[in-house]
Amino acid sequence: KVSYLKSFFANNLLRFIMDVFRINIKKYDLIISDFEPISAWSSKLKGKPSLQLSHQASLFSKQSPRPIEIDRLAEFFIKWYSPCDRYIGFHFKDYDKNIYGPLLRDKIVRAKPRTEDYYVVYLWNYNVDYIANILSCFKNYQFKIFDSRIENNLQIDNCEVIKTGDDSFFNAMLNCKGVICGAGFELPAEVLYLQKRLYVIPIG
């Protein structure tokens, strides 16, 4: 479960405050950020106009989907982590007048996907052995697990574990049956655009 207070204090609070006041934004007419707190808070405290472009910004609108049970602490965190004067949000649908669909990489839009007999797995916050142990129960399926922490590629039962690299991951995603990943935004948006099966694990 995500602890917002723990996440906040795990970072150096004093260093954050110093960076907010140290950053020089005097010569800029507008500060544009991507859910980045230092420039956002600096512009707010110094009276500079600011614009946020991000998926998280879409949650500023009450029209964006919410769970049935609202997490007030999460709402507070989203609102004040990276404050701004105006925003343009990106989501899976245009839920409000200043919310637009996902921004996709050119190579995703130009891609010609195929369907081969394997699934791509990208769960960076889980241990590879833990993932492989679960997926090895599905003997009739093949999985390509991507992880940046391994030194060399290896095979664990029906799971090929591959060191994460942009080209290798992109090619694997392009030609897979489906993707198993965290419930973020950018990667799921690309997977859905490529019309692949998508399985997500929410953070919570």
Question: Language-model segments: which ranges?
Answer:
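Catalytic donor nucleotide-activated moiety binding site of glycosyltransferases and closely related
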Residues: 123, 130-163
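A donor-sugar binding/catalytic signature common to diverse glycosyltransferases
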Residues: 30-38, 42, 52, 171-204
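Nucleotide-sugar donor-binding patch of glycosyltransferase catalytic domains
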Residues: 54, 67-70, 161-164, 197-204
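Donor nucleotide-activated moiety binding/catalytic core segment of transferases
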Residues: 15-25, 149-193
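A nucleotide-sugar donor-handling region in carbohydrate enzymes
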Residues: 61-128, 145-149, 167-168
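Structural motif
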Residues: 29-30, 86, 118, 178
